Amino acid sequence: MNEDHEAGNSSREAEVHQLARQFTDQSNYSAAGQNPFAVEAGSALDPNGEHFNARAWCKAMLQMHTGDKQAHPLRTLGVAFSNLNVHGFGSDTDYQKSVGNVWLEVLSLVSKAFGQKQRKIEILQNMEGLVEAGEMLVVLGPPGSGCSTFLKTIAGETYGFHVDKNSNINFQGIAKQMAHEFRGEAIYTAEVDVHFPKLTVGDTLYFAARARAPRHIPGGVNATQYASHMRDVIMAMFGISHTKNTIVGNDFIRGVSGGERKRVSIAEACLSNAPLQCWDNSTRGLDSANAIEFCKTLRMQADINGTTACVSLYQAPQAAYDYFDKALVLYEGREIYFGRTSMAKQYFLDMGFVCPDRQTDADFLTSMTSHLERVVQPGYEGRVPRTPDEFAARWRASPQRAQLLQDIKCYNAKFALDGEYLDKLKQSRRAQQAKAQRVSSPYTLSYVQQVELCLWRGYQRLKADPSVTISSVFGNTIISLVIASIFYNLKADTSTFFQRGALLFFAVLMNALGCGLEMLTLYAQRGIIEKHSRYALYHPSAEAFSSMIMDLPYKIINAITSNIVLYFMTNLRREPGAFFFFVFTSFVLTLTMSMFFRSMASLSRSLVQALPFSAVLLLGLSMYTGFTIPTGYMLGWARWIAYINPISYGFESLLINEFHNRDFPCMNYVPSGPGYTDLGLNNRVCSTVGSVPGQAFVNGDAYIESAYIYTASHKWRNIGVIFAYMFLLAAVYLVATDFITEKKSKGEILVFPRGHEALKKGKSDEDLEEGSGRSVTVEKTGSDGLTMIERQTAIFQWKDVCFDIKIGKENRRILDHVDGWVKPGTLTALMGVSGAGKTTLLDVLATRTSVGIISGEILVDGQPRDDSFQRKTGYAQQQDLHLSTATVREALEFSALLRQSAHVPRQEKIDYVTEVIKLLDMTEYADAVIGVPGEGLNVEQRKRLTIGVELAARPQLLLFLDEPTSGLDSQTSWAILDLLDKLKKNGQAILCTIHQPSAMLFQRFDRLLFLQAGGRTVYFGEVGENSQILIDYFVRNGGPPCPPAANPAEWMLDVIGAAPGSHTNINWFETWRKSPEYARVQEHLAELKRERPEQTNLFRTTSSQKREDKASYREFAAPFCAQLCEVQVRVFQQIWRSPTYIYSKTALCVLSALFVGFSLFHTPNTIQGLQNQMFGIFMLLTVFGQLIQQIMPHFVAQRALYEVRERPAKTYSWKAFIISNIVVELPWNSLMSVLMFLCWYYPIGLYRNAEPTDAVSLRGTQMWLMVWTFLLFSSTFAHFMIAAFDAAENAGNLGNLLFLLCLIFCGVLATPGQLPGFWIFMYRVSPFTYLVSGMLSVGISNTNATCADNEYLRFDPVNGTCGKYMDSYISNMGGYLEDEMATSDCSFCPIKETNVFLSSVSSSYSEIWRNFGLMWVFIVFNIFAACLLYWWVRVPRVKKPVAKTE
């Protein structure tokens, strides 16, 4: 355990930390010990002090723990497994889905449903093993050998594969209960880091500690103090205390470094207190010291607490391997060794294999799975196993396996299933659980406590990022003000009846649909919540419940601010009871519809699934409120929609609230005007529905009864119905959250374009995780691809580089006077602890930073960097970001075509890509689709592609690589270094950050730049043979000698005190600055600066290149037209290969159009019917919101790839990016317009209105053109909105706000004549004004109108016939009589022609082409505005040259 080392105490910290967490699970304070919860600041037990000693803290916790064992029984969990077989189901047609072939998938699903058998893929075969409580198992094997599947199986996470029913797994006497009752006792920690990005590290870990805090807490502290202390201890142990107030971040939101984020994930899992822990490559991204420290932590936890750990490691330092008790070696899903780590190497040596010098045991064991790496002893060539099956057979025949079976048998006898240990574990869990928690629950806290804790986290998240909430409140208040000003101070007479209905309709919709964007945030956080559920921290429904409560203050504020403005400015019923009822109903509707959106999100597994159906549902809810289609006009087959629609009940109640028991003076009588001045009340009638001859007013109850068939007695009944819906939807939401998980990938299977040769070959049964298997080195013929790689001559140097960034109010120096150079034909390693600034230095040197202040001197051949620098360098980032729909070859060709010099012929660039593919050994999967992690290329293949994309660009200066071996096993890491070696030998200059290099790997670097925390240089110089130059430097300056068997890369981290527990009294930064090596570096930098410009100028002169082509200094290699062409082709390809996106867009357009069309099927041309047809157009436009919600996330994903990788590499310009993304939507939306037109225009029956004038074809074409411009406007408007915003949610909020303004001012809800003068300009600038006017005039002009029975106005003539009595009025005002010869009870219809209705809403068929032209003006404006906004907000400005500091 290296306890004699000076670093021993601290190095145990992490172990102790785990230990501590377990200790606190079961503890009572012993008076003899010191209470670690009540210590002096700065003491050895204070995790926030400099002198914190993990071992001392651990001992103190141990003393507290040993008191009351009944209250805190120790909980351990081992596992034995035998005959363990795991399989998945695959298909021979692993082809890429596209818009054209996705139907074949439907056919295959149908055939599966009818019993066609799928191909079974064996993942794990005949596994046997035993890991007892307190033991550690290391799982070794290359990526795709089944390591992850094995760990997931042990932890009970079997989504996507099947454990054979005859498999035997015994968790110390427990079997079937593990998955549910004891979930959280065995946990699986995945390789990826999933956290709330805007939450701080401190809050993230406090939450985990509090969620598993035991009922009985030692030391006299409460749960909050306990959780805070545990958080501080674990952060101190993992060396992340300094990140406490920094947000965690993710790949796109800047937070802590990648290594620090990995340690946050480890710390969070540790705080879950699980007695059986499965860690899947959890050291990925950690330096060697932290990786070893992690294993030490697990070792101490196992020794003292009896915790069991199963860990897969892809690059295991020898020191880390030595902490494990047992090893499992997997070879393509077969077990080829299981036993003591100390005996594993000898087992294979005895078989006839040789372990090369300085190869670690773990690397040697893993090398057994590769025929290219394993070395056979002379004379054993024919006797050693070669295939996975042969290795497995040799293992099954071995005495070690016989002993293992005997041990498993004894274990199963000792821990019989459902025996006494099951009761012991239940008692132990019960002692920890809150009193209110069920015994059979896997959770520690009670449900109420879980909700409270999630509420606390919700508040922290809101504080960290209130932008969406604030923008929502602001947007809704603006909308309310706008609507209120349109309907300002409505008169209390009959002239405002329609306006009051329209106002209440809009108020209901605004309150009901304002929370639609909640769906987006629910999908974003789903993966995090499911991980916490697997750790048994809380029920997903507890988080759901807390988020409902967390949103209440916002909803209350929103209801008050929006509705007060709306109610009083518009002069709705000025009575206290009516006002409070209005606000109350609006608020209850908001809550109910929030539950509707949330339940929609929880019932579907992805946003793409949910959007089309939720859009149609929303359309249904909006149309069937009772306003756009009054109850009497609802068709029989669809009337039930109103009964299940909560909004319709709210609208009815608000209408009753406004009109009940009120009489409204009549403002317009029929007949009236010249000749009708002195009429009695019986001889004229109010021209409003619900009027009664002889009355000078209209009763409100009569009006709503006649127009809407509403009854006053329903007012409070409806509120009860809305509440019932609210509780029902809330229950659906909470239950679905607990049971329906997000869409997961099923394992890494290579996907090829349909028809590719790889699909025609019979596949071998590979590991499901792997698909096409590891990319083994293929024997090459002839050239290995090096001949085409340009030999470089430029020298890159930097001096006194500093980088400062503002975090909060303080300035923090990330890099501190860093010097160095990279020369052609050299491989330079950049190393340091996690968070030392390695990636930041690469970003600064590669001109990739967008924030912060850079100072110092960065030169190429003694000259400052020019505009072309970024495209002349290659930068392989740590994150493997690629376009998921492209193939490997397409990705490489895209890079080559756009980044290689324009003078290179196209065919030569494509040939060069073929050479790169050979060089990188990617021939097997060159035409495979990249896919997303899990479905497509595996980790190693992605990493090769990342490097390949940069090589394809033919970088003329140098190649930067950030963690090229991160997450890869030792074999693949070696292959990557082989590749770098090839490049180096051909003159490539390479600067590469690296974590966890083995001694053999480290030896392959020529030079090392070594940074300590704070971005300070510790060493820059040659590594030397066997790292001797490096070792001599540190020993000479006071470091301890390097043991012969030690890995120098790990040793030097210990020497400078960079390992979490190590300590040094030497200031290595100052030592370096005072060393002769530093002086020589400064001299050489000055020499390079002085001589290189002269040498390069001489070279240019002698080679007849006195004036280099201007093109080589351009910012982009390819001209703009070539950029646009290539990018456009790629985006079209991507859309074609995204069938889900296209078909969800199709479903949205077709289903919405059909729904509106058939809801208003063949609507008659009555007064209400004409209004319904107008609302048919109005409701069709409401799909606008869903259309832009579909486009925005798609665009954000594209933009992330462009801004994170392609823009910094100067692959193509922002103009090509934004234009191609706008253009690609236009053809698809043109196709959608045809479908939408056909599904809407004909069912609604508008074509019949063109028959009298024989213009059916012309007006049909005109209507399609208007629908077409609507969809083109929608897509360009979506890009206009999202161009500047980071988040689709914020852009969606603003887009919805502007969409509502367009809708409000289009002339439907309030005609131009009814608008206040101030708002006339909005009527004129709203695109929907011209759209609705054009569609309405084309749809209903130049035909006759009639009245329905309840629309006729009835009165008695003064004398004579009705015709004679009304003759003068009809000639002036229009209209017709039902029976002109009647002498009493005249039935008069005020409208005879549809053009009269059109003129009332300021629409005219003569303006159709003007309206069409104006829509194109708006479309073009959107495109220009999107480009301008993107340039203004998101394109980095040209920075000043780097300042030189002395």
Swiss-Prot record:
Subcellular location: Cell membrane
Domain ABC transporter: start-end pairs: 104-357, 796-1038
GO cellular component: plasma membrane
InterPro entries recorded: AAA+_ATPase, ABC2_TM, ABC_trans_N, ABC_transporter-like_ATP-bd, ABCG_dom, ABCG_PDR_1, ABCG_PDR_2, P-loop_NTPase
UniProt cross-references to CDD domains, sorted A to Z: ABCG_PDR_domain1, ABCG_PDR_domain2
GO MF annotation terms: ABC-type transporter activity; ATP binding; ATP hydrolysis activity
Membrane topology reported for the UniProt record: Multi-pass membrane protein
Keywords per UniProt: ATP-binding, Cell membrane, Glycoprotein, Membrane, Nucleotide-binding, Transmembrane, Transmembrane helix, Transport
Transmembrane segments: 468-488, 502-522, 548-568, 577-597, 610-630, 719-739, 1147-1167, 1177-1197, 1217-1237, 1265-1285, 1301-1321, 1412-1432
Chain sites annotated for binding ATP: G832, V833, S834, G835, A836, G837, K838, T839
Glycan attachment points: N9, N28, N222, N281, N305, N1344, N1359
Matches recorded under Pfam families: ABC2_membrane (PF01061), ABC2_membrane_7 (PF19055), ABC_tran (PF00005), ABC_trans_N (PF14510), PDR_CDR (PF06422)
Role noted for this protein: ABC-type transporter; part of the gene cluster that mediates the biosynthesis of the sesterterpenes ophiobolins, fungal phytotoxins with potential anti-cancer activities. Acts as a specific transporter involved in ophiobolins secretion.
Family per similarity comment: Belongs to the ABC transporter superfamily. ABCG family. PDR (TC 3.A.1.205) subfamily.
Protein name (database record): ABC-type transporter oblD
